[in-house]
């Protein structure tokens, strides 16, 4: 428990350092290196899938073993040394401060009426085209990103830490990074990235639904509409193209009385994603801040729940 709380506090105070030695940056470099080595456009679909699966296995093994080795050697440190090493590594696997900082920055620009710069900033955190987005569309994109990334950027790493300590949290982050880099359904990655995408879907199965429940409790604690959040999650979560992505987004949409989803543009091509929630309010800057509050509340609730469950089970905490 000390490790998880310390990791959260390290992130809250320091945030993610912008360094080429950041573990997730190193994972990205390894993935890019292996992609260059394994991907061949002329390969058959079956071979592309096999080579992509090999990339996944290698990245997972290296990431897990590196974290396990660091934790093994940290046990020789005096006092709280091992817990602090674990907390530092775990803090690199979660990103509440980065999400909050990005959201607050976009919110501030919208309040100033600076749509041009807000479009630029939101373009850093979403994959869609942003050059023609309205204020409501910028706010929608930001809320969707914060909600979805609460799963893979906070709750899921902490969930896998609870199960298997720091090495398993690192393994999850490696899997999620592979999905974000090669898990696309386009011509290049449809087969090569399929193993990465399927693995990410499987790993997020429980954390995504857990995040939805945490958001409902958070909505109740913060005075938002928890009942509507539950109803919208049950009604709309399965409409998301991802098997997991809809739970956090639908719950936030219900709690804040907004509608997410709709028309997005990718590389100049419009794509419609099913609506989630009801447009009781027009999505705006205040909903970004409310979503950030829900994100932090859900994180604290998870840490409290983590403590209670492990105490009841009689296990020592990581």
What do these predicted ranges mean?
Residues 1-171, 175, 183-318:
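Hydrophobic alpha-helical transmembrane segments
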